[in-house]
Swiss-Prot record:
UniProt keywords, alphabetically: Lyase
CDD domains for the chain: HAD_sEH-N_like (cd02603)
Source organism (scientific name): Aspergillus calidoustus
Keyword Membrane among UniProt keywords: no
Keyword Lyase: yes
Function summary: Drimenol cyclase; part of the gene cluster that mediates the biosynthesis of various drimane-type sesquiterpene esters, compounds that exhibit diverse biological activities and are widely present in eukaryotes. The pathway begins with the synthesis of the backbone drimenol by the terpene cyclase drtB using farnesyl pyrophosphate (FPP) as substrate.
Annotated protein name in UniProt: Drimenol cyclase drtB
């Protein structure tokens, strides 16, 4: 596919340095440049002398003063060499798939002067000066003329101009358009449009491997396991991260805690995430699950810390615990916690964030992990339907890059796409290939936010490269019984087998699973 970039020249690639003193005042000069006389001159319908004489008559001044003022303006014209180099690199990196065109409101005499301001014009495949074409921006006819000449589908054309009227005309014809205001911002947008966002994101992660650490919103470095685990799950690349695993349970911090108490307990959030991602022996998982069950509060809700002196509860922490339980077929051991997070989802109690998390998208994203880990059945089916409804409600809501990536991933996990959100996410990519830091979680006391560009980038790459997955949410009849048996067997496999009775129950459960599987095969053969 060949794409096209159409650029304005004046005030985009070339800049004017206004002369300190001119025969014509700056106010009058501005009026001249916006007059219909100047428009006709730029279309090539008036000669230079005709235009200057008409302007002198209109604005009660001498034609020679008009001419001298524009001579001074021409002399001040300067090529932006850095922006030109950027454009050359952009075109070179496209490997022949990008054509660059100039489209400028400029008279024939002024265009001849402009050509002398640069030695090398090979950047452009063609230039369309209004004085030679007989039309000018924002005339729709001028845009249609250029589109016909370059023979590129309008959806593959990007237009850059510093004038909003011109940009509006281009957009009305279906062109993707960038209003030139700040050069750095335009360069970022063009890099995102014509580059490969995913490849650039992966390059950023690779260039910063093992240094993708967190920081507070006040730029204080934070060494934490949680952010590393999120990067690991999103990328499946252990070489990118540096963690400090716990022997059994995990701590949020790597090394000494920061900006909190001198000693900091292990927490259920980090531990559950780790046991969902990092291969761990069943005996360890089983012992942690049993301890978590024993730590439920009077409402049957799991806490945040393995420390009874810190009775904190957060619905997203609960969801992450349930996700780990579901991975091992044990979600039924926390019925009150399941019921509570379902109520949080149903009543949209997550919209204002939670104690430790700032965005609604964080709750929805982590909830999709929980639903994904559930075995097919009524619970999965009901939660999947409600969660899908809640995620759809958030589509196109303005949020930061991380929250947007979380939302897109949630959409994909639930089986539908979010093309508008993906397009927005791509525009947020920074020039270095990473995505902006955004608050992932926060300190419970005071609410100081913790960010990580590595997490933002890893999540963004996964979001834009992902696609909706087909999910099975419910199995009825004998299939449901087979799944139930398998869940029971999975749970038993996590428990120590220390007696003859345990062995007997394990063997019976295994036979139940295999017989159910055989019955399903027979049913399927009848259908086929």
């Amino acid at each position: 596919m060949v794409r096209a970039l159409i650029l304005d020249l004046g005030d985009v690639l070339f800049n004017w340095d206004a002369p300190a003193s001119t025969p014509i005042s700056r106010k009058t000069l501005g009026q001249m440049l916006h007059s219909e006389i100047w428009g006709e001159y730029e279309r090539g319908h008036l000669t230079e002398d005709e235009a200057y004489n008409a302007l002198a008559k209109r604005y009660s001044c001498e034609a020679k003063d008009v001419a001298h003022t524009f001579v001074l303006a021409r002399e001040s014209l300067r090529l932006d060499t850095k922006f030109k180099t950027f454009l050359q690199t952009l075109k070179q990196n496209a490997n022949g798939s990008l054509r660059v065109y100039g489209m400028s409101n400029i008279s024939k005499p002024d265009f001849e002067v402009l050509l002398g301001k640069a030695d090398d014009w090979t950047l452009f495949d063609k230039i369309f000066p209004s004085g030679h074409v007989g039309m000018r921006k924002p005339d729709l006819a001028f845009f249609r003329y250029v589109l016909k000449d370059i023979s590129t589908p309008v959806e593959d054309v990007v237009f850059v101009d510093d004038n909003l009227d011109n940009v509006t005309s281009a957009r009305s014809l279906g062109m993707r358009s960038v209003l030139f205001h700040k050069k750095d911002e335009v360069q970022r947008q063009l890099t995102n449009i014509f580059g490969s966002p995913a490849e650039r994101g992966l390059e950023y992660l690779s260039a910063n491997k093992t240094n993708l650490q967190s920081a507070t919103t006040t730029d204080i470095p934070i060494q934490d396991n949680f952010g590393q685990l999120l990067i690991l799950e999103a990328t499946e690349d252990p070489s990118l991260v540096r963690m400090e695993p716990g022997k059994r349970t995990w701590n949020f911090f790597i090394g000494s805690p920061s900006l909190t108490t001198d000693t900091f307990p292990d927490d259920l959030d980090t531990t559950s995430l780790a046991l969902s991602i990092v291969p761990t022996s069943p005996d360890v998982v089983n012992s942690v699950i049993d301890e978590i069950i024993s730590r439920r509060d009077k409402d049957g809700i799991v806490p945040t810390y393995f420390d009874n002196t810190r009775p904190r509860v957060d619905p997203i922490v609960c969801v992450n615990v349930l996700s780990m339980f579901a991975k091992y077929g044990r979600e039924h051991d926390l019925p009150a916690t399941v019921a509570w997070v379902r109520d949080v989802l149903y009543h949209r109690a997550y919209l204002g964030g939670t104690r430790y998390y700032g965005s609604a998208e964080a709750f929805l994203f982590f909830f999709t992990r929980f639903v994904r880990n559930l075995r097919p059945g009524t619970l999965k089916q009901d939660l999947h339907a409600l969660l899908s409804e809640r995620v759809r409600e958030r589509l196109n809501t303005p949020v930061d890059a991380l929250a947007l990536s979380m939302r897109i991933q949630a959409c994909h996990a639930l089986g539908f796409d979010a093309p508008a959100d993906i397009a927005t996410l791509i525009t947020m990519q920074d020039e270095d290939g990473g995505w902006p830091a955004a608050v992932i979680y926060k300190y419970g006391a005071g609410g100081l936010g913790i960010t990580n560009r590595g997490v933002s980038t890893a999540f963004a790459v996964k979001a834009i490269t992902g696609s909706p997955v087909k999910t099975e949410t419910n199995i009825g009849g004998d299939g449901a019984r087979a799944v139930s048996a398998m869940s029971s067997l999975e749970a038993r496999r996590l428990q120590p087998i220390s007696s003859v009775g345990d062995w007997v129950r394990f063997i019976i459960a295994s036979l139940h699973v295999h017989l159910a599987w055989l019955w399903n095969v027979l049913l399927l053969s009848k259908v086929v």
